[in-house]
Structure formats: structure tokens, C-alpha cells
Amino acid sequence: MSGLLSSLSSAAQSMDAQRYGMDVTGQNIANLNTEGYVRRRLELAERQIVAGVGGVEVVGVRATRDQFVDQRMRTELPAESRDSAMSSALAVIETSLGSTGQSIDGALSNLFKAFSNLSSDPQSAVSRDGVVLQGTRVAVAFNEMAQRLDDSAHQADNDMRASVEQINTLTKSIAKLNQQIGDAPTNADIAPLKDKLDIALQNLSKITNIGVIMHPNGTADVAVASGHPLVVGKFSYDLNITNAPVTGVAEVRTSDGTDITATLDSGSLGGQRAVRDTLVPGYQQQLDQLAYDFATAVNTVSQSGFDLNGNTGPLLYLPLATVQGAAAQLKFNPALATNTSLIAASSTGAPGDNGTARALAALQNQDKARGNTATFVESWSELVNKVGTDSANARDSLATRHEVVSAIQGLRDSVSGVSLDEEAGKLLQFQRAYEANAKYFSTINSTLDVLMAALGGL
């Protein structure tokens, strides 16, 4: 009798275990498309036979997580996000430069054509109006291009400020999850909390490079690349934004006031800083140098000539004090717009002479830019090519990084992801085991009924 009762108990426990397995499998299938979900696995063990009772016992439910793969993902994501931020910003800058012949190069060509027309008829009011019109358009083209580059730097600065806010939001979330995990009862299911923690850490690593220390209880401590803590246990430490004294751009400081801006070289925050502090300033310097070289060359020739009244030629462009900011400050002399007779076309002062107009037109093909090694259009093309090359390199690097991240994600999915085929097989396995144990239970129960009936008849 006791043996049958033991078998009945063993069958019931096994049925419970198989039903639990079906529940776990169903949970996996339900979360097939849930971001950050890690596949659960039911762990069973043989129950030691004691007093004739054996069978199976549920050890627990384990999340199939590989900490090494998770760490590798957090290592690669910052580089991918950095390239993504740079690629996006450079695509905008590349577009803002305009197409060949429709930007600064086109404006310069039209001005030199106006100088050529003036040389054909130095006293023509129409030709002089053409110089004013095209000269003004060149200045406007430089001004607008300088503004576009400044807008790109300003956008990158705003993006940095937003990224710091996102970092602070995520670190607060991580600290809260640490507290929930640490306060959870010993046998509580904290797998969902760990999933949320992993998502938060992954999202944080997209913004900036972080160091993560995982503790045995499942909590995580986080620090930025400089070593300054962001999360320690249930406490989070905000990054703060201050404005640089001269430029007013964002500086990133830790909770103790340390400026870590220069160390932010990875993640989307690192890409935004590279755009703001390195790429755009480099383009601005090239553009400013071109504007300065152009204005200097044109003004020098103009001042060597004479206007219609026989007076020394004027500045075609208002004087520029320094190279820095030249593109934004370039302005056609407004006095010439109100009195075109002041435009110098003659090199001798004699009526009908066109020496200065010809000299101005000839500047188009002279190496007066980039330290007298390139023409103005060639210098502009060099800037366009530089932006194009940087943009292409960022795209290529992003593609390479994406392949690496995709490969790691594939490895991660093979370990932690949910496979419908695999789960369907497990579901069938648990179902059949349940049915077999149910049949075993029914058989033992029937045998007991027969035995009890027999004993009752004695």
C-alpha cells in the first residue's frame, strides 16, 4: 500500500513539474518579440528516493544569459553609436554644401564673369551693376555657408545636452532597479528586473562608453570611461552641463564638478562632440581661409586701379580683421551699390582703360588661395571633397561596426533568444511527459481503488 501511495505522490509531483515546464515555455513564446527578454529555462533534477518516494523536483527557472556576450555588446555599441551620430551629422553638412556649380563655386564663377563683362565695357552701367549684384551674392553665399556650419555645430551641442539628460534618466532607472533586485526576497523571480537592467545598461552604452561591474546578487555598478561613478548600488550620480565661459558650448561635468568633456570620445555623445569640436571647426577654418584669401586678393587688385573719376580704387569687400569668422563677416562694400562709378576698372585712370577689370577677371585662374597653391574654386572643391570623404568614411565605419554588433547580437540570440521551433519542441515534450505521468497517476489510482475495494470486502 505504501509503495503505491509513494508512486502516486511521485506521479503528482512530476505532473506539476511538467505543467510548470509548459508555463515557462508559454512565457518564452509570449515574449518572442519583447525587447531585452532573455529566454527562461526550467531546471529539473532527480529527486532522491527517500522512504520509497523519488521522482523529479523543480530546481528553479534560470535565465539563459551570457555575461561575457552582454559585456562584449556593451563594448561594441558605443563605437557604432559614435559612427552613427557622426554619419548623420555629416550627411546634413554634405547636403548643405550644395551641388557643383550651385554653391560658392557658382557664385565665384558668376562674379569673375561679371569682371570679364566689365573689362569689355569699363564704363557700362549695366556691367557695373552686374559686379555689384554678383559681388553681393558671393558675400551672401559665404555668409549662408558659415551659418549652416554654425547651425551644425549648434545642433551637435544641443544633442550633447540632450544626451546628458538621457544618461541621467538611465542612471536613475538603473539605481532603482538595483534597489528592487537587492530588496527582492530570496526565492523571488527577479529575471524580469534583470532584463530591464540589461536594457538600461545597453541603452546607456549607446550614449557613452561605460564600465560595468556586475555583482553576484544581480545588481550593477556603472562608471563613465574616466572612472567617475554614475551608479553605485541604489545611488545614482548625475552628470551636469555647464556653459563654457567664452564660447558658451556645453561642458560635461561629474557630480563633483570634474570636467570630463574631453574624455567623451565614444557613444553618440562622443560622436556629437567630435562633430562640434573637431569636424565643423575644421570645415569652418577652411571656409574662413578661403573667404579671407578671396577678399584680400580682390581688394588688393581693386585698390591698385582707378574708378571712373580717376580716384584710387576702393575695397570691393569691407576689411576683415582676422581669418577666423571671415566667411560670416564677408560683406560687399555698400558704397559701391549706391555709386557704381566708384568701381575700379582702369589700371591707368585713362577713360576706357580696362586693366584692373581684366586683372580682377584673371584672379579666377590664379593660385591665390591656400597659401598661393590653389585657385579659389579649387580651394572650395577641396573643402567639399573633405566633407564628402569624412562622410563616406563615417558611413563605411558605421557599416563595419553594424556588422560586428549584428554578429554579437546573433551570438546573443543563440544563447538568450527565443526560438519558436525550439520552444514548440519543448512544449510538445512537456505535454507528452505530462500525459504519460497523468496516465501513470491514473493507473496507480485505479490500482489503489481496486486494492481498497478488496480490503473493504474482507
Please tell me what each predicted stretch does:
Residues 1-458:
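S/T-rich, low-complexity, solvent-exposed segments of bacterial secretion/appendage proteins
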